[in-house]
From Swiss-Prot:
Span list, region G4: 136-139
Region (G1): 19-26
UniProtKB keywords: Cytoplasm, Elongation factor, GTP-binding, Hydrolase, Magnesium, Metal-binding, Nucleotide-binding, Protein biosynthesis
General function of this protein: GTP hydrolase that promotes the GTP-dependent binding of aminoacyl-tRNA to the A-site of ribosomes during protein biosynthesis.
Name the record gives this protein: Elongation factor Tu
Keyword check for Cytoplasm: yes
Source organism of this protein record: Clostridium tetani (strain Massachusetts / E88)
Broadest EC class assigned to this enzyme: hydrolase
Residues binding GTP, per UniProt: 19-26, 81-85, 136-139
Length: 397
């Protein structure tokens, strides 16, 4: 049979299953692929195929993740499922598996558990804005009032972490029953209802090319008689010759310039877009007025900041991280996009020290300003080796 071509006719959305261990995340993932597979929208994956997730290395951190894909009438989905709790923490903080939205799986028999809370908190910190709830194992609960109680608890928990808990769709069912009886419409209805809720409630993400232009500067050189060229990979947006941009970061003032030429693979371009590796010729900018670690950005779209709160995962010794804990006032380098900037950290009240393998909210004060938005990822480095990975959850100055 000839291989099918990947059709990009439907909008693409990245989602994932989150929730407490043994509440049925992997069973649900298997059920979704199996039931959509029966309708011709997916390749069915068995529980074991999803559960034995391959280990991946992302920024030196070992993460086990399973990726499956499937379609509904309206969309194409890439879906991630992690076997272990630590894998979720690492995945969400490093952004290894991007999620535009999530399916929170809660066992109706047990109600919200510690990791339920932790995953909701993490989702709010790393910018996952839309959560659809699946109350699983409903076949184990005889009393409808108990299910209503669990639903109320989950909605309250979501409200507590800034999600619209009262508006979030909640679907009740049994992933196992659906998986075991894919032909039985009554058993599979909960999966169809869940996917309908995901289709409707999780918005199609804005494409990278629709966002304001931004390119981290990797290198700078001078072309005699033409001016200064900054090279790098366009992170988002589109850049056209004649566009006005700002050079942001590593100083308090941003400098404006106009793009007088764009080159890619030694060919001249009229416009560059997200993903392109380019050289941009800048009008009126001297070689010493721009440096690696700054960004070129659409005017007014990004500001330089020096203090922020970050959600951080600290690498374990086995991952090449520190062998010892660190304390308040620790001063490592923070690696943003293309450069290291020294900063000092303040730990939350009541936290004396941070051990390798922990994840923690910390306040960071950098010695110089860096172009940043909430949701920007960074690495924490010490003498050139990565000891932590983080995401900016709130900018304070």
């Amino acid at each position: 049979m000839a291989k099918e071509k990947f059709e990009r006719s439907k909008p693409h959305v990245n989602i994932g299953t989150i929730g407490h261990v043994d509440h049925g995340k992997t069973t649900l993932t298997a059920a979704i692929t199996t039931i959509l597979g029966h309708k011709g929208f997916a390749k069915a994956f068995k529980y074991d195929e999803i559960d034995k997730a391959p280990e991946e290395k992302e920024r030196g951190i070992t993460i086990s993740t399973s990726h499956v894909e499937y379609e509904t009438e309206n969309r194409h989905y890439a879906h991630v499922d992690c076997p272990g709790h630590a894998d979720y923490v690492k995945n969400m903080i490093t952004g290894a598996a991007q999620m535009d939205g999530a399916i929170l799986v809660v066992s109706a028999a047990d109600g919200p558990m510690p990791q339920t809370r932790e995953h909701i908190l993490l989702a709010s910190r790393v910018g996952v804005e839309h959560i659809v709830v699946f109350l699983n194992k409903a076949d184990q609960v005889d009393d409808a009032e108990l299910i209503e109680l669990v639903e109320m608890e989950v909605r309250e928990l979501m409200n507590e972490y800034g999600f619209p808990g009262d508006d979030a769709p909640v679907v009740v069912g049994s992933a196992l029953k659906a998986l075991e009886n894919p032909e039985d419409d009554a058993a599979t209805q909960c999966i169809m209802d869940l996917m309908a809720a995901v289709d409707e409630y999780i918005p199609t993400p804005e494409r990278a090319t629709d966002k304001p232009f931004l390119m981290p500067v990797e290198d700078i050189f001078t072309i005699t008689g033409r001016g200064t060229v900054a090279t790098g990979r366009v992170e988002r947006g589109i850049l056209k010759v004649g566009d006005e941009i700002e050079i942001v970061g590593l100083s308090d003032e941003s400098k404006k310039s106009v793009i007088t030429g764009i080159e890619m693979f030694r060919k001249l371009l009229d416009e560059a877009q997200a993903g392109d590796n380019i050289g941009a010729l800048l009008r009126g900018v001297q070689r010493d007025e721009i440096q690696r670690g700054q960004v070129l950005a659409a005017t007014g779209s990004v500001k330089p900041h020096k203090s922020f709160t970050g959600q951080v995962y600290v690498l374990k010794k086995e991952e090449g991280g520190r062998h010892t804990p660190f304390f308040n006032g620790y001063r490592p380098q923070f690696y943003f996009r293309t450069t290291d900037v020294t900063g000092s950290i303040a730990l939350p009240e009541g936290v004396e020290m941070v051990m390798p393998g922990d994840h923690i909210d910390m306040k960071v004060e950098l010695i110089t300003r860096v172009a940043m938005d909430e949701g920007l990822r960074f690495a924490i480095r010490e003498g050139g080796r990565t000891v932590g990975s983080g995401v900016v959850s709130e900018i304070t100055e």
